[in-house]
C-alpha cells in the first residue's frame, strides 16, 4: 500500500509472510508474519525525515521473535560542495526467545562532497547498537536487524558476514570515490 503527494510526502504499509531460499527454492518461513508502516517527509531539503514502525511475530533462524521496531531517520541528501548528514535512532520492544526484549541502534554521520575528479566524499560516522549485557538475566538486549543487509557502514563483509549491528560501538572516518556511474569505492 502506497499513498503519496509525490516529492512532498509518502506513506507506505505492508504485511508479508517472509520466505527463505533453500537450494534455490523459496519456502515460506513457518508461523512468521512481518509488517510495517513508514512515513517520509520531503518538504524541507535541509531536513528530510523518515518515521517508521516494523513488527515481526514468529519463529525463524534466530529463534522466536515478537517485537516492534520504532525508528526515525533525518538526513540531508549528498550534493557537491555541501555538508550533508544522516542520523537514525531505532528502538525495539517486545519479546525474543521468551525473554523481555529491549534493544536500540544509533547512527550518526556528517560528510562533505567535493566536485571534480572522482567526486570524493569525506565523512565521519558513529554507530552504536545494544547487546545483551548478561545472557543469564532473562532479558534480551541484542539489536536485531530483522531482514536488513549486513553491509551498511561496516563496508562489504563477505559471504560469512562477520559484522552485525549488535553490541557495537563503532566510530569511523570514510572516503567515498565515484569512479563512474557503475563503480563506487570506499576507504
Label each residue range with its predicted role.
Residues 21-26, 58-61, 93-97, 158-161:
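Extracellular loop and loop/strand-boundary signature of outer-membrane beta-barrel proteins
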Residues 1-23:
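Outer-membrane beta-barrel channel domains
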